[in-house]
Amino acid sequence: MPRTHARGTARDRLLDAAEELFVERGIAATGVDAVLGRAEVSPATLYAHFPGKDHLVAGYLERRHERWRATWDAALERCGDDPDARVLAIFDALDDFPTATSTRGCAFLAAAVEVTEPEHPAYRWLAADTHLLVERLRQLAAESGAADPDALAAEILGLYDAALASRTRRTVAGDGGPAPLPCRALAASAVVRHRA
């Protein structure tokens, strides 16, 4: 494996390596030794930053959550004051997100399959991701004039999840894969249909 982490702090190299490996292999299938090798750091360096693998997983999801939030914030900023565009900005953010073509799809949904105990240090980031999606979509739906913001938010979230699944299936299948679902267009129709 070529060296990909020549720069940055040891903590950043650990998080970069963990992200690459968790996306490639999954969390449970990735051992600490693989992360250490990819990051080119010692076990002592890992434990100086993270008490163990569970906390490394939490650090990975925390950083991923902050990157996703920043990407979505930027997409919202580009929409200006257009309330309909702001509801749909989640799809723009998905297009802009650096790992939109991952074969594992959403890092949080993939991690939720492996991190199921609420006491796990990473669980709070799974909850934070869901909270961000639900609450922000509800707020944006209300701002768009939806008669039932909860219903519109739920529909947009379902279409967002479908967009993630569609991208994953297409990435796995390559060029011969199914056409991507028109989730953004379906969401735009939902915004109009839910208007008060």
Where are these regions (language model features)?
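Hydrophobic alpha-helical connector segments
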Residues: 59, 73-103, 153-156
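N-terminal intrinsically disordered/low-complexity leader segments
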Residues: 1-9, 16, 195-196
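Amphipathic alpha-helical segments used for helix-helix packing
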Residues: 86, 99-121
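Amphipathic alpha-helical packing segments from all-alpha helical-bundle domains
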Residues: 66-69, 73, 85-89, 118-143, ...
